[in-house]
A protein has these predicted regions:
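Conserved small/polar residues in nucleotide/adenosyl-binding loops
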Residues: 163-166
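Gly-rich Lys/Arg/Thr-decorated short loops/hinges at beta-loop-alpha junctions or inter-strand turns
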Residues: 14-25, 52-55, 76-84, 117, ...
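Cofactor-/ligand-binding subdomain signature composed of acidic, glycine-rich
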Residues: 2-32, 43
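Glycine-rich phosphate/diphosphate-binding loops that line cofactor/substrate pockets in enzymes
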Residues: 13, 38-55, 110-116
Length: 166
């Protein structure tokens, strides 16, 4: 019942840290789904760096999103995000968050002030917020993304909105 652990397992357990979910380059890292969404832009930044690109990330959305604790997890990982040139700025509402993320894709319009080769963005919100952002999404889609940019939209269903129950 309390048999000693094999040396290899004991050593592996001694090296585990709570930051592994954001810093481990290979092997197993245990994390929740929300923590995986926090790690996602860090992995994109590392992929870009391996391709010789100097990119940054920008995350915005609505704090009332059903993606519970996403904003809290982003704040908790602030030092890891900053080390990868990733900024988290929550929006006052879904539309302002989406508009801010869309703005990151206009980097190529101002080549004289470019600090980065590209900026990738993440927008998050609730289902009704997707409806509210349709104008921003339509215009952003028509404008496209920066050459070395791109955007991911994460949406969760609102618990009181029958049209968006998940």
């Amino acid at each position: 019942m309390n048999a000693p652990l094999p040396e290899s397992i004991r050593k592996a357990l001694e090296t585990v840290t709570l930051d592994d979910k954001y810093t481990l380059g290979e092997g197993r890292a245990f994390m929740s789904g929300v923590q995986a969404l926090v790690r996602l832009p860090m992995l994109q930044r590392q992929r870009d760096a391996a391709a010789g690109l100097n990119t940054a990330g920008f995350i915005s959305g609505y704090r009332g999103s059903p993606l519970g604790t996403y904003d809290q997890a982003l704040w908790a990982a602030k030092k890891h995000l900053a080390a990868n040139n990733i900024v988290f700025q929550p929006g006052v509402n879904e539309e302002l968050g989406a508009t801010a993320v869309w703005g990151t894709q206009q980097l190529d319009l101002y080549p004289q002030s470019k600090k980065f080769d590209g900026v990738f963005g993440i927008w998050y919100g609730k289902g009704p917020g997707v409806d509210r952002c349709s104008d921003v999404f339509k215009h952003a889609n028509m404008a496209g993304t920066a050459r070395h940019g791109g955007v991911i939209a994460l949406a969760g269903g609102g618990t009181v909105s029958y049209t968006h129950l998940t």
